[in-house]
């Protein structure tokens, strides 16, 4: 089992409940999409799984370990096995892309190697290979502030590929990309995860991409799991309920009297 959550709640300091009674299991190597309206708790769930936030109640197990039962040092070693892809990657503007990618293994390297690599990138070939998979091989020595939002997101994905993470948690990893590039990038991420046996959980606003690229889809609404289904079983009724009064918009009937059709915006 790659991850397991039993009865997980998350209540913020202001009393707002972000997650309620989350029960979830992902086997090693599974690839799962997480969808739901804005504010549903998708990012909160990913932060709990990354052991960035401690749940208010319930049990969390990641890669065979209970993170909050570990010492701080052991928890840091666990985090080094987890790859995070951010919607807006936290990359220093003046940092070179090669250093941003190599940072994926800083938690796995000895301290001396990590420090040296920050000054003089030690594995340029490895960084280039990861970037080349995302058509960014020519950006190896560019500064991060010279890249577009979509390019920065792909650098973040390249860093996780270089890291060889056992568990990949991706929060809106393609939100800054056009539809075609987003599809290509998700297909690549899925192929790489499958080839390496990595577990992949990605939150997405674009429902069409979730259904197209992931075998299993989880719908989250108001901090609770609304459904957990194979992609082929996610029907219109499930999506209508998930996005009720949130993102679904009905087209007016055509002059010929055709019924209204419900559309889910990509973002």
Curated annotation (Swiss-Prot):
Residues 3-247 form the ABC transporter domain. It is a peripheral membrane protein. It is an enzyme of class 7 (translocase). It holds the Pfam family ABC_tran. SMART domains: AAA. It is found in: Cell inner membrane. Its EC number is 7.3.2.2. One of its GO terms (molecular function) is ATP binding. Gene3D superfamilies: P-loop containing nucleotide triphosphate hydrolases. It catalyses: phosphonate(out) + ATP + H2O = phosphonate(in) + ADP + phosphate + H(+). GO terms for cellular component: plasma membrane. ATP binds at residues 36-43. It comes from the Bacteria. Keywords: ATP-binding, Cell inner membrane, Cell membrane, Membrane, Nucleotide-binding, Phosphonate transport, Translocase, Transport. Part of the ABC transporter complex PhnCDE involved in phosphonates import. Responsible for energy coupling to the transport system. Belongs to the ABC transporter superfamily. Phosphonates importer (TC 3.A.1.9.1) family. The complex is composed of two ATP-binding proteins (PhnC), two transmembrane proteins (PhnE) and a solute-binding protein (PhnD). This is Phosphonates import ATP-binding protein PhnC 1.
